[in-house]
């Protein structure tokens, strides 16, 4: 048993991350975490927010692990263009990392990709390439948060028929 916090865990106050880390440590199970758009440090309105403080406090933002027959990939999909504006998706460097990571995973394994902003909108950067990679596996699931409601979304067959589980964020 384990948990994954899919972001928006500090409500615009990244200085709370140390306390969040301590709290997650009391869960009695391993809990992994990703940053949401409300967890990145804001310098000012012009400078794009980044996850450096999240990495310092919580650990890497792009990583993977195996639990039984499941390969879990966690990635930061929040791309800030200023201190207030952001989009979602994966950079070319992240896509290369994902491709390399999955090259070691047998095709019969289940893969779960965890990130913050749902990919169902169709505008996420490198979304088609990510879905194509995941479609090569016997079973793949997408796990997101960001919204303030729960939704299950099945991508079209053209998108690999991937199942996106969208969980309401705890804050934001």
Across the structure, where does each feature detected by a protein language model lie?
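N-terminal active-site segment of His-dependent metallophosphoesterases
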Residues: 1-18
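Charged active-site motifs of nucleotide-sugar-dependent glycosyltransferases
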Residues: 2, 71, 110-111
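Residue-level marker for buried hydrophobic side chains located in beta-strands
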Residues: 3-5, 33-34, 113, 142-143
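Short acidic, glycine-rich surface-loop motifs adjacent to enzyme active sites
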Residues: 6, 102-122
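Active-site glycine-centered loops adjacent to acidic/histidine catalytic or metal-binding residues
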Residues: 7-8, 36-37, 116, 145-146
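Conserved short-loop catalytic and cofactor-binding motifs
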Residues: 8, 83-86, 118
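Extended active-site neighborhood of metal-dependent phosphoesterases/phosphodiesterases
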Residues: 14-107, 126-141, 149-172
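Histidine-centered catalytic micro-motifs
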Residues: 113-118, 140-150
């Amino acid at each position: 048993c384990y948990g994954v916090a899919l972001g928006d865990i500090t409500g615009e106050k990244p200085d709370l991350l140390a306390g969040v880390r301590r709290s997650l440590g009391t869960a009695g199970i391993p809990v992994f975490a990703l940053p949401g758009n409300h967890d990145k440090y804001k310098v000012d309105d012009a400078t794009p927010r980044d996850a450096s403080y999240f990495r310092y406090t919580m650990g890497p933002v792009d990583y993977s692990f195996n639990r039984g027959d499941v390969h879990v990939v966690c990635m930061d999909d929040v791309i800030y263009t200023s201190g207030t504006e952001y989009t979602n998706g994966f950079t070319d460097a992240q896509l290369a990392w994902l491709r390399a990571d999955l090259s070691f995973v047998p095709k019969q394994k289940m893969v779960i990709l965890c990130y913050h902003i749902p990919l169902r909108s169709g505008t996420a950067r490198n979304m088609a390439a990510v879905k194509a990679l995941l479609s090569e596996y016997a079973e793949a699931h997408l796990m997101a948060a960001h919204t303030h409601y729960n939704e299950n979304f099945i991508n079209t067959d053209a998108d690999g028929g991937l199942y996106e589980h969208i969980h309401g964020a705890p804050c934001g």
